[in-house]
Structure formats: C-alpha cells, structure tokens
Amino acid sequence: MTINVLFLAAEAEPFIKVGGLGDVAGALPQAIYRSSKTASSKNSVDIRLVLPYHFAIKQKGLKPKLLGDFYVKSVDGPEPCQVYYYDQGDIPVYLLDGDPIDEKSPVYSSDPIYDGYKFVFFSLAALGLADFLNWRVDILQGNDWHTATAIYALKTLDITSPHLSQTKALHTLHNLPYMGFGVQKALTDYGLPAVKTSILPEWARHAPLPLALLTADRIVAVSPHYAKEILTPEFGCSLENFLKTRQSVISGILNGLDTEEWNPETDPLIERNFSVSSLTLRRENKVKLQRDFDLLENDEIPLLTLISRMDPQKGIDIALKGLEYIEDLPWQAIILGTGNPIIEKMAQDLEKVYPNRVRSVIEFNNKLAHQLYAGADIFMMPSRYEPCGLSQMITMRYGCVPIARATGGLVDTIQHVSHQVNGGTGYLFTRPYPSVFALTLKRAIKHFQDKKKWKGIQHNGMSIDFSWEKSAQKYIKVYKDLVK
C-alpha cells in the first residue's frame, strides 16, 4: 500500500531557509521517502513538498516547469494560482504562485495582514493542488501557522473533491507562541467559517494555528517533552486547558540532524577533522580559536561558547550574568550571534568586563559556528523554552559538551551527567536563573579537570544517532495509524 502525503511548508532547504522550519521541511520529507523504501517498511510513502513560490526562490534561477493554473475561491471572486514543478529526484516539489505572493516581499514580512493573505491563499491553493494533479491525498501535513489554514479548511469547508474525501489532517507544531495573529480578515475574505465552539478561547478563534490544533486528526510536537509542556501554564500560551481536551491526539517526535552537513570527520569548514576514535586531534580546533581570538593558549582552561540568535527566548542573559558568578574559576568564552540590540550590548559589555577571557562576535558567521562546535569544550544553551533545538545535537556530535536548561527537546536529547564515571552526555539545569546556571557550569568545569570522565562524556555524546531516519520512521507510524 502506498500512502500519499502532501507536505506543506512556508520554507524548505535548499529552496529557501529563514529559520529552523527550513531545515525540517528540507530534510524530513526526504528521510520519510527513504525510510519507506527500506525492506523493513510495509508501506511506501509518496510524499510531495509544496512551497509558496517566494521571490527569494525565483532569484535562485532554478527554472521550475510551469504545469498550468487553477483558481482559488475568495469572496471577491476566483483568484488564479500558477503551479510550478521542480524535479528534486525522489521528492516532487510544487511551487505555488499568485497575486497574494508578492514578488517584492520577503518570506516573512513585518505586516501580519499581508502575511495573512499570502499564507491563507497558499494554504487553500495547496488543497486545490489535489484535483489539479488528479492525485489522492491520504495525509495532509501542515507546519506551524503559515499552513494551518489548510488543515482548518479541509475539516470545515464543504470540499467536494474526491481526492480529499478521505484525507486525514496532521499538523506539526514547531513553536506554539507564533499563532498567526492578524490573519482574521484574510480568513474572512477567503470564506473560512467562524469558530463557534467554546472549547477554544474567544481570543484564539481568529488565528490559524489554534484553528488547526482544534481540527487536526493528529498533532505532532517537535519533541516528546514539548508535547507535554504545552499542556502546562508555563508553556501553553494560555491554550493549555484547550490543548488538554485534545491530549489524546497529541504526541511528540524529535526532529533530526543533517548528519552529512554536521560531520566532524568530513566538515570542510573546521581546522582539523576528527572522530570518536581520533578525539585527540580535536585539540587543534581549540588552539586555532584561542590564537584567532587572542586568548591564552592553554588546553587546561575550558573554552565555553554560545551560538544563538540574540532573542529573549534563548536565555542568553542567563548565561552572560551567570558567568559573573564564577569569575574566580578558569574559563574562556566566545559568544556568537546577532539579534536583539539589548542582548547584543550585554555580550559586548561582558567582553569589556573580562577583556582577557571573553570575545563577543555580533554577526551571523556559519564558518565560525562550525569551528566553535569543533573547538570549544562547553556549549551554553540556557533557553527559556526550546521546542526541539538543533544546536545541542550538533555540539554533542562534535565532542563539545552542552549545558542546557531542562526544557523541551533539550530534555529528550541530553542525558544529564550523573556521578558515575562515564554517565551522561551533558548537563541540565531546571530553573532559568543565572545562579542556577552558574552552579551547573561550576560542576561541569570541575568535571573538565578529570580528563577520563570528560572524555567519557564526549564519547557518549558523539555516539548518539541524531539522524533524520529515526524521526522519519516515527512519522511513518503516525501515517499508518491515521489511514487504518
């Protein structure tokens, strides 16, 4: 039996990437297709990726094939949608275009009304794609608020298409706070019915994401722990009571890591390649960092790093303030990232306070990020919330030991170091306070002095399989359950 999956996303590598969704949508469909073709799989999956034909994609010069067009209904009359096809090998890719997808706009603009029209149009056009292709859709998979309207429309509009008559809706939840507010007028103008149920709070009835969470047959959060957290007041964004009514259809599947791009054995962006069996070579990467940043060249001093978007969610202030609590201990730190000007200034100010041990690099620098993963000893990830997280997987794969807040996917991926000789892959702290972070970091620095224990922690982290295949197999199981 072949399961047909229409996978909708606002972005996907290698076509367009703005954030983490681009990584997921670029890698997951490919992994699902590959996993479904293995001898152990009883179901083949025909998964097709659908993206808006953003201006940024057009600039890449890919030259997709124009297949034709069809019309999307709106209260002002039908709107044309052009369908382009790009042959990506195993996964067919469809790029949908139309007037609401303005050629001059970015993928995500600062105007929620404009983005609302663009993504509501795209979501409804994606439903029309089934008839255009004469292709039965077994699973419609949405991602975040941008494609949530497709889920809601499938379940609430009077859709007569035989290709959608048995379709099940699965919505993947990447980041609950981003619900798509400001989209109400677009929903009305495209004929989406108002929500009348009292289960969903009044304030949430006009945003696409809550509407998808209300109507989807299955909801998959991007980590098992995050699937539990969204049911609590701290992480539920005032939807926790509503989400508890949907608890039976909520589960969590951890995102994967592109293990070809992030491979210390072959990474062309680092000074010295290494593996678990040649871990001593890793030191050359640390030496390069210390020399490049004019830090004391001493392998006995732990080199800390933090690579992140400068955003309050990431808890960077927790780490920066926490370092001041342990100024009497030996450490060096390199901070890399850009974003919120207040947090950027905090990083720069810390360098002024500790000019011999702190370096702040306020920019996006992919090459430096690779080198930091490969050369630093300890990775700081004090996120206030982290639905899945990617950096902790990379850092462990590169032999850099993470210290992270015990939240979301960080709980699912980091095994807290115990008092045993070789237990764990990193360190977790519970409360998001600088003092608590500092105590955990102090413990890690103490363990760093014990070379046998530290090497064991590195080995544990580097030995974990974070590939997308594990995630893909779990999604295929969800597909099977839905089409039974």
Question: Language-model segments: which ranges?
Answer:
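Catalytic cores of nucleotide-sugar-dependent glycosyltransferases that transfer UDP/GDP/TDP-activated
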Residues: M1-K484
